[in-house]
Amino acid sequence: MKQKNINKMRIISEKCVIIDKKKLSHNFNEIKKRIGISKIIPVIKGDAYGHGITECFKTLYRCGSRDFYVARLEDAIKLKKQNLKNINVFLLSGTTSKETCDQLSKYQINPIINNLSQLEIINQHPKAIQYILHFDTGMNRLGFKYSEISRIKSLTKTNLIKFIMTHLSSADEKNMIECKYQLNQIKKINSYFKKPLSIANSSGIFLGKSFHQNYVRPGKSLYGINPFFKKSFGLKGVMSIFAPILQTATIAKGQTVGYGKSYKAKKTTKVATIDFGYSDGYLRSGRNKVKVFIDGNACDVIGRISMDLITIDVSNIEDKDLYLGKAVEILGDNQSCEDLAIQTGTNEHEILISLGMNSKKVYI
């Protein structure tokens, strides 16, 4: 990461969360190359996976996208208030009340209808609202069941159904038996409706053409998360994070670091304290496991991760490079969110959302 971008961030905060819009655009275009005539509907829920929903929305709009998925009504309204032309916003949570439907109608937001209760609520609204029907074909989370088709058809007007969707449960594990079963099920279901289809999430996109159908729904892949372990598919990480050194010290063999004395030095060790902690989304499960980087050199995080601070072993770094304010890479070119996920025992989504949420960002 160029020093000028880090310096730019320091006007706002010592911690640097940098979002590269060019890489986001690159990932969009890499996905576009793979899907032929199918259409991309970006998933920008979870504050665009921690990257900032408004800026990511605008960037993807400039890439040519006009349709977007969000999970919360307030996010859908926020996007509609941007007043960009010809956008469709699809609300994954659907509707829970007449009041919600009032907002859907006012802002022309299209809900995902997941069950008969939601369908009845939207049918009772005095103004017609177009929606998407979501069928459960194996996820067992949200969605109509196959057995409910007759009831659904009796409650729906064909012109109000924009398309039919389902969600793959095991695409990231490349469980082709399950994925093909779900694909066949949704095709069978759609034979009753004859509408456009959407089945592929990020991982589903990379399973092959048969899963693309009319619409694909990339989420994590837009932000550079590879759908399958250690396969890049040309995707680039969009988020980089840097934090400054606050202090350095040398401790003797046998001395300990941090709360609970969980780290004991096996030899004389140079330690740097970094202005970053779990209040910034750094997972405490990473203690004595994760690494950070100084000028491309790996340094172990040692001791417990504190609310605002982490301590690192910098014995391998020259003293001249350990000055106050020196930028330490938490996430970036040397360490992907996949690396951090492995080190902390979670998935890449949680890493990005945890680190990105509630942070001030610089967009480049």
Go through each PLM region and give its residues.
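Active-site anion/phosphate-binding pocket segments in diverse small-molecule metabolic enzymes
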Residues: 2-20, 25, 75, 95-96, ...
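Active-site-proximal beta-alpha core segment in soluble small-molecule metabolic enzymes
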Residues: 11, 15-19, 23-26, 36-188, ...
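Conserved N-terminal alpha-helix of the aminotransferase class I/II PLP-enzyme fold
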Residues: 30
